[in-house]
Amino acid sequence: MFTEIGFSHYIYWQTQDKKTLQKINKLLKSISREGPLEGEGKPERLKHKEGEYSRRIDSENRLVYEFSEETITVKACGGHYEE
């Protein structure tokens, strides 16, 4: 599941940088296989945003998400913890 901003970032990578898109897809697979707190991309809880976590896409971009027992919601997949 994506927020509107998260989905717009995802669409951006589809047209601008296939390598980054592949990394995002790899991180999403890792979340679904290993859980939201384990796996690739150095998962970490965001201190300034309660209930949100991030993983490194690359040195400049982060995958920001939140999760419940049933759903993972991608809030952003570009930038560095942006609103």
Annotate the PLM regions.
Residues 1, 23, 45:
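Amphipathic alpha-helical recognition patches that constitute DNA-binding helices
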Residues 1, 14-15, 33-35:
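Short hydrophobic/aromatic-rich motifs at helix boundaries and adjacent loops
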Residues 8-22, 40, 53-62, 66-83:
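Enriched for short, Lys/Arg-rich terminal
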Residues 21, 25-29:
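Short, well-structured alpha-helical segments
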Residues 29-56:
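A short, surface-exposed loop/turn module that caps and links secondary-structure elements
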